[in-house]
């Protein structure tokens, strides 16, 4: 059995009120087109053809070499859009899935079941349908007394009886490939919209006494087509619920799943605890036994097993096992933390590698640095890495002790086991096993305070 796919992605999406093509709006971190294409791959199409139009280069860039593309210059209806794919699929034997690129909730399992139903029933066309509590706006499935599909009627063309029908057309179909393009040559624009309706091929097949069937979705949510921001928000809500439920089934605990945002490509190992208001985005991986507390935000990062992240932001970073971060820490892109590193409150790390068991407990900036293992970085330490034009590196050896309020002016190297005195400004190399003091000597002038305006004696 050879399968093909046509994805309709040419529309502008006027009701989205956006410069972005409709299919490129995102749901849980992926464009709607990407969601649809991932589901389409479940039927293993020998060729996928995407019909593009509005801002076509942006749409093409999303799928790149995963799909062939055809251009629909004028949007003259769904039938016209499918006609554009004939140059890619003409004369081929097999079954062709036609699906809209704005249906992000459709699953690969449903599409595979649709194809199997189509093949097993030897249909020339199979419509993916759903039962709607409120069918207004959808095309209706009209059956005869024997339950056979006889036609699909659009909302604007439906009579009073047809408008009461609850079974709706989802806009997804499977056709015999050759018969599809033969039938498309017979459709017209004689309808309320003045467009080429793809649905008209059903009546053509019926007139030729060819078999047309309908496969009913079990979950109506999968049929959602996104035409405006309201529907986009609905799709986001449904997708978010799916994602959290998947992770819960796989052993992840959510204290308040309704408040958590997790994107589609995030991976979470079993026995992770996630509190409320946590955001996980991009290609993030969370290791087993990790705890993510309220307010944590992580994007494109790897968190090692058994770590604790407390109300902190982590971007494009790699953390080994047993790391503790936060509260209120910020790990910026290019940060690597080895095992059992502690990054405390109000610490920012950027573009740096920090060795195992090193601690930076509070109020510190570490940028463009290589920090060894078992280093203590005192409160208020700053690596001065930028001179207004260039960035420079700071290197700190193993077991070094950086005193509180140290200012390390890069480029700089602090050797193994070295110690910087609190309040020091260091601009030259510190050899291993050395103590460096880079501050002014304290001068005490007894009784001088009485001469100053703030002294109580001055107010008398």
Swiss-Prot record:
UDP-N-acetyl-alpha-D-glucosamine binds at residues 8-11, 22, 72, 77-78, 139, 154, 169, 227, 332, 350, 365, 376. Its cofactor is Mg(2+). Its EC number is 2.7.7.23, 2.3.1.157. It catalyses: alpha-D-glucosamine 1-phosphate + acetyl-CoA = N-acetyl-alpha-D-glucosamine 1-phosphate + CoA + H(+); N-acetyl-alpha-D-glucosamine 1-phosphate + UTP + H(+) = UDP-N-acetyl-alpha-D-glucosamine + diphosphate. Pathway: Nucleotide-sugar biosynthesis; UDP-N-acetyl-alpha-D-glucosamine biosynthesis; N-acetyl-alpha-D-glucosamine 1-phosphate from alpha-D-glucosamine 6-phosphate (route II): step 2/2; Nucleotide-sugar biosynthesis; UDP-N-acetyl-alpha-D-glucosamine biosynthesis; UDP-N-acetyl-alpha-D-glucosamine from N-acetyl-alpha-D-glucosamine 1-phosphate: step 1/1; Bacterial outer membrane biogenesis; LPS lipid A biosynthesis. Transmembrane segments: none annotated. Gene3D superfamilies: Hexapeptide repeat proteins, Spore Coat Polysaccharide Biosynthesis Protein SpsA, Chain A. The keyword Transferase applies. Keywords: Acyltransferase, Cell shape, Cell wall biogenesis/degradation, Cytoplasm, Magnesium, Metal-binding, Multifunctional enzyme, Nucleotidyltransferase, Peptidoglycan synthesis, Repeat, Transferase. Catalyzes the last two sequential reactions in the de novo biosynthetic pathway for UDP-N-acetylglucosamine (UDP-GlcNAc). The C-terminal domain catalyzes the transfer of acetyl group from acetyl coenzyme A to glucosamine-1-phosphate (GlcN-1-P) to produce N-acetylglucosamine-1-phosphate (GlcNAc-1-P), which is converted into UDP-GlcNAc by the transfer of uridine 5-monophosphate (from uridine 5-triphosphate), a reaction catalyzed by the N-terminal domain. This is Bifunctional protein GlmU. It comes from Streptococcus pyogenes serotype M5 (strain Manfredo).
């Amino acid at each position: 059995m050879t399968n093909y796919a046509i994805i309709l992605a040419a529309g502008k999406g006027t009701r989205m009120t956006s410069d972005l093509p409709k299919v490129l709006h995102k749901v849980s971190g992926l464009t709607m087109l990407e969601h649809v294409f991932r589901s389409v791959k479940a039927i293993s199409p020998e060729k996928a053809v995407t019909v593009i139009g509005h801002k076509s280069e942006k749409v093409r860039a999303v799928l790149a070499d995963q799909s062939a593309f055809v251009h629909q210059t004028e949007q003259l209806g769904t039938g016209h859009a499918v006609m554009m794919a004939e140059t890619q699929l003409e004369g081929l034997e097999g079954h062709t899935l036609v699906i809209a690129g704005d249906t992000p909730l459709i699953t690969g399992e449903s599409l595979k079941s649709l194809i199997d139903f189509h093949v097993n029933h030897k249909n020339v066309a199979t419509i993916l349908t759903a039962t709607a509590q409120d069918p207004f706006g959808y095309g209706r499935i009209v059956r005869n007394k024997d339950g056979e599909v006889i036609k699909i009627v659009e909302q604007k063309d439906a009579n009073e009886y047809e408008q009461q029908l609850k079974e709706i057309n989802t806009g997804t179909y499977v056709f015999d490939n050759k018969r599809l393009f033969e039938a498309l040559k017979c459709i017209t624009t004689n309808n309320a919209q003045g467009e080429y309706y793809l649905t008209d091929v059903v009546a053509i097949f019926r007139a030729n006494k060819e078999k047309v069937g309908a496969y009913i979705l079990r979950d109506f949510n999968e049929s959602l087509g996104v035409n405006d921001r309201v529907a986009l928000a609905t799709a986001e809500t449904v997708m978010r619920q799916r994602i959290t439920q998947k992770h819960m089934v796989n052993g992840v605990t959510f204290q308040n799943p309704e408040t958590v945002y997790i994107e589609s490509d995030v991976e979470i190992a079993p026995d992770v605890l996630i509190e409320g208001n946590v955001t996980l985005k991009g290609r993030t991986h969370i290791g087993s036994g990790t705890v993510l507390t309220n307010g944590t935000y992580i994007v494109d990062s790897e968190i090692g097993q058994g770590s604790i992240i407390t109300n902190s932001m982590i971007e494009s970073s790699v953390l080994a096992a047993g790391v503790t971060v936060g509260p209120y820490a910020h790990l910026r892109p290019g940060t690597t933390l080895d095992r059992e590193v502690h990054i405390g409150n109000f610490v920012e790390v950027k573009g740096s590698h920090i060795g195992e068991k090193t601690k930076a407990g509070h109020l510190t900036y570490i940028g463009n640095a290589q920090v060894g293992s078992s280093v203590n970085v005192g409160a208020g330490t700053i690596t001065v890495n930028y001179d207004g034009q260039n960035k420079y590196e700071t290197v700190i050896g193993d077991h070094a002790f950086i005193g509180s309020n140290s200012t390390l002016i890069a480029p700089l190297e602090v050797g193994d086991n070295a110690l910087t005195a609190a309040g020091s400004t260091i601009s030259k190399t510190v050899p291993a096993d050395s103590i460096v003091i880079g501050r002014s000597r304290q001068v005490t002038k007894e009784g001088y305070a009485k001469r100053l305006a703030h002294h109580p004696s001055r107010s008398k």
